[in-house]
UniProtKB/Swiss-Prot annotation:
This is Pullulanase 1, chloroplastic. Its EC number is 3.2.1.142. It comes from Arabidopsis thaliana. The keyword Transmembrane helix does not apply. It is an enzyme of class 3 (hydrolase). Belongs to the glycosyl hydrolase 13 family. Signal peptide: none annotated. It is found in: Plastid, Chloroplast stroma.
Amino acid sequence: MALTLTPTSSVHLLSSISVARPRIFAADFNLRSRWRRRRPVTSISNFRLRLPSKTSLHCLCSSSSASSPMSLEVSSPNSQFLDCLIYSRAYWVTQGVIAWNVDVGEGSCYFYASKSAGLSFSEDGIDGYDLRIKLEAESGSLPADVIEKFPHIRNYKSFKVPKDLDIRDLVKSQLAVVCFDAEGRLIQGTGLQLPGVLDELFSYDGPLGAHFTPEGVSLHLWAPTAQAVSVCIYKNPLDKSPMEICPLKEANGVWSTEGACSWGGCYYVYKVSVYHPSTMKLETCYANDPYARGLSADGRKTFLVNLDSDDLKPEGWDNLADKKPCLRSFSDISIYELHVRDFSANDETVEPENRGGYLAFTSKDSAGVKHLQKLVDAGLTHLHLLPTFQFGDVDDEKENWKSVDTSLLEGLRPDSTEAQARITEIQNDDGYNWGYNPVLWGVPKGSYASDPTGPCRIIEFRKMVQALNCTGLNVVLDVVYNHLHASGPHDKESVLDKIVPGYYLRRNSDGFIENSTCVNNTASEHYMVDRLIRDDLLNWVVNYKVDGFRFDLMGHIMKATIVNAKSAIGSLRKETDGVDGSRIYLYGEGWNFGEVAENGRGINASQFNLGGTGIGSFNDRIRDATLGGSPFGHPLQQGFITGLLLQPNAHDHGSEATQELMLSTAKNHIQTGMAANLKDYMLTNHEGKEVKGSEVLMHDATPVAYASLPTETINYVSAHDNETLFDIISLKTPMEISVDERCRINHLASSMIALSQGIPFFHAGDEILRSKSLDRDSYNSGDWFNRLDFSYSSNNWGVGLPPKGKNEHNWPLIKPRLQDPSFKPKSSHIVATLHNFLDLLRIRYSSPLFRLDTARAIQERVRFHNTGPSSIPGAIVMSIEDGHRGIPSVSQIDPIYSLIVVIFNARPSEFSYPSPALKDRKLELHPVQVMSADEIVKKSVYDSFSGGFTVPARTTTVFVESRNG
């Protein structure tokens, strides 16, 4: 039966079966649409409804258009049955239990298996199976251990699996469970999700990947659902025909083979014969090794490489652990976030062949390296590199890149649309991407190397780490274990889903891959995913000697995975492993959303769950309160430093009383963050009440504070995501203020992070007014919009309207700002901002009082003044008092200063504040600020007699009391 419909048709279906069925029809309508997976359904050319046989159907349609015909077809019983198997709504959770959300009633449930993936349906029933067994429905709930592992199916029914089955063999088949009513008619059928039973039967801690011995090479692949595995060995990376094909032997889900020493330096791929639920077929998949340690260009083949080979080690590599920058405590860390290509792509002081790659960090005389050295000399400790593993969307071979002639862009108007149009035209074929689209986690990205094939990327990555360590910087890698770039049996960048389909990727209750991260969410609640992540981290620590990890969307990873990884890394010893694991710091994005929210798939690594672990998470509270709004709100929403109440912009923020409350609330959030966002820290709120940090609430009643230890808080106001610090300030502040004022606000924001307890985090370019021409998401905006200029001649403001895709809705706000020449800083502004930023680092590292190690130390020493209902809006007064004769109960940790007072004046006018609690002290301007190039901060005054402070507009001033003063 076929009907012609239009996209605006209204369709009502009336069936002779249960009135509950139309709801199922509607769901199937959406799932069968042509664009089911990655985009919303805005128009549909055809769809199918799955109906039981012999069902009478009436379709009532109305339409406003006679164009764009659509067809409606009623499928055959067999196609209806096969469509059921598209879904995997049942879970084989243990050897003895299958969980399914179905009520059998008086009917029955059967389990089917077909090694050839030949299950079908005819009038005689289900055909094509090798095994058919009856499952017994059990009363009561699922076992407690099953609910703990799979909390999202806690209400499912339990079906008992007979004990005499060869489950190790059955999991290699197409599997289905089917319900029949009391008269034997098919009610429902579905495929199965297998991770539970795979974990129970096949969890494995032995060798995986390639292992080298004097006798040869051994390969090991975990693939318990595969029917056959062989390895294709290639002499050269571009060879189309293998020089050898070796079948692998299986032992309890692990496939292995032994090869000759001559295999070393060759390339290989696995050939895997496996049932794939996405196609419902037995597929032959060609896949890289999940434990690959080397690759050919674009990851076409895995490189058989021994990372312990002396040929791959730069001079002095084995002794690098002895030359690591000193790190007394994690509380001494400060982090600078940088993209490898941004660092040098436009730096003419770097050799042309090294620009945009690993080796640029070895160019000691380049502008970029000299800039990093300035930061290190002022105190910076850690360099966070955006993804450097093998990721998709950038060709490893530079000769394939497309580029734009920038000379054609340089003369365009600051608000021109032409630059973004030209960049967008080639953005998927150029050399730029942030890299949050992982293909293989354990190998350096080839496009950053001089030669992407063979050992070059390994050697050059090691040289980069070594050079940065010698500069004084610890190296942090941005790791993306929460999702994969590709899935399915045939995508060239799919790996894990080819080897054990349906295991590595988290699936929803219908059996489809979860995409809340963006695409292809991974499932670290499954043992071998957890293991792969832990093994990969150890690979980077031991083989590349990196000093820390930042976890992208860490909340989508289970807490146990991160905690166990931290423990495994911490156990590494310099004497036995060549690295000191105790100095390696872990932190990440503890956002709590998607299917994992509120521990939906187990206890996840979210902000609130990580308290007490020593693992850091980004504090978005201090960011939003400082700047205003959020990355998801209106870009003109103002905050503490951008003019809320005190210098409003054109956005409607509500009444004056509303703005006063908003500003007071923002101050509470910031002060909590400055105390390392500790949940038990006591402070006085805007109402004059003594409250804990966990009792300070956000607009949705979520507690602001979540940390138990200072090092669990990463304070920041900017990162690679969203607008740069200078850009967001330029959006939120009133149009009429001067660029001088915006520069002071930029510095004020940095100071609030640099002088807070916890770990400060800065985006590369914060210190030189970096602009992306107001681009809010520059992940694929090319070198043009992401430009960093370490010559300090330009901050990249006004290089055209930012790319349309992510920014067009804001163009009406952006255009007048780019048009106005007064918004663009001069080189003198950039240099002054850099000097002021270096001063902040020098101040932070001038006293351990800015870097307190424990929650108790912060509670004892850190106080906030100018609080309560009578406080002066727009200013924060913080004191940090060390132990001395006046407070003998507090130990002395600073031999130089007994008291530090920091005043953050975000007001557009001078701030005067008398503090009786700070009378009769010997406070003076911090020596760094006495010598500062900023003449304005030198106008700050303290009067000992009254305890009064006077600080200029939009200025952060640090007063110190010397012990010998």
